[in-house]
Amino acid sequence: MPIRCDMMAIAAGAFLSLQPAWADSAAQPLPPVDAGSRMMAIGPENGDLAKRVGAWTVTETVWDAPGAPPKVTKGLIAERRMVGSMIQEILRDPADAKNTVLRMDYLSFNRVEGRWEYVSMDTRAAVGIMTAQSIGRGRAAQIEVVFQPFALPGAGQDVSGQMLRMREEIINVAADHDVKDQYFTLADGTGAEWLAHRYDYVLR
């Protein structure tokens, strides 16, 4: 019996001697996360974008001028995927055997600046790389970005270099339905804005 008591006392002493080490370990604060790492996290705004990935059927409508009749192209396919915190969209015509990229864009919320950033490239028009930003945070269900002014080559054989302003509204109509509207304003002295381009997306 005395031997058993001695063994219990030794075990209890060992337990108590280890307890402060456990307590000290539990009390150690987690290492601080630097600002860059925090801002690289996807965040709620880009988390909403991640819900829009997948394949979408697109109807494209173009109005060349205010009051012009619409030109409609149906059955295009947009493929969306996340690239880091950005959503990438690639537009193709499934009837094209070469699977040519018609248009590509990227959209992301810049958590440092607190605004949306957007870039697009259209292989069907001589407009180069177009960049746009929002004024502020806005709403995830309706994002508005304003493009840097750019020039159209103009009609006919001679390059006229018609300057153009453009803003774009990206509207989440429903979980399976998006609309992207582009409004043009020509630098022609009228200041008239019109809906020039619409992409209507339905999730496949």
Task: Name each model feature, range by range.
Residues 9-19:
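Bacterial N-terminal signal peptides
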Residues 51-52, 59-65, 109-110, 180-192:
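Short beta-strand segments and strand-loop junctions that repeat across beta-rich extracellular domains
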Residues 83, 172-176:
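Residue-level recognition of beta-strand termini and adjacent short loop/turns
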Residues 27-31, 177, 183-204:
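Edge beta-strand at a domain terminus
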Residues 1-10:
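Bacterial N-terminal signal peptides that target proteins for export
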